[in-house]
Amino acid sequence: LRAADVVLDGVVVGRDAVIGGVEEGGAILDAALDYGAVLLCAEALGAMQTLFDMTLEYLKTRQQFGAPIGKFQALQHRMADMAIHLEQARSMALLAALALARSAGGAGSDSANADRDASAKTRRRVVSAVKYRVGLAARFIGQGAIQLHGGMGVTDELPASHYFKRLSMIELTLGDMDHHLERFMAQPGFREAA
């Protein structure tokens, strides 16, 4: 899906405006996209936590058959599954932040450059694993929250619908789950470990 075409005609960029060296643009862009993906995962984590909390409160207050619907075991099981997905996503988001911190080393000796290259490969693998896992959790928690809210879950009056829409957009931004799964599997070491 293209939203726009950008055409640069007659643009001259001076040497002082170049970021990085020759043939380094891809690595810089790759790192920037990874940072963006991790920030989106952090945003998704906040949205999932909010949806979880809203849904839990709704189950405590919504009455059916003379009791809060949160007393029904089937709904308790669904909330437990949502809590598991939420905590897995939280752990993965922390892992991604750690991978970014480790790959953020500066320039230096050849050994430092080799370490940075290895860190970049690890960063790519970790970020893709995290974006995939957070996407799964966002879909599970978002859909679960909407379903547990019943018909109210899809109305604009209830904030849950807006959080669900945002989670759906986050999953598609900077590479969807399929893209990140393919990227993860393409990393060196994946086939040998499998």
Per-range role (PLM):
Residues 28:
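Short, acidic (Asp/Glu-rich) active-site segment that either coordinates a divalent metal cofactor
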Residues 22, 31-194:
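Alpha-helical interface subdomain recognition
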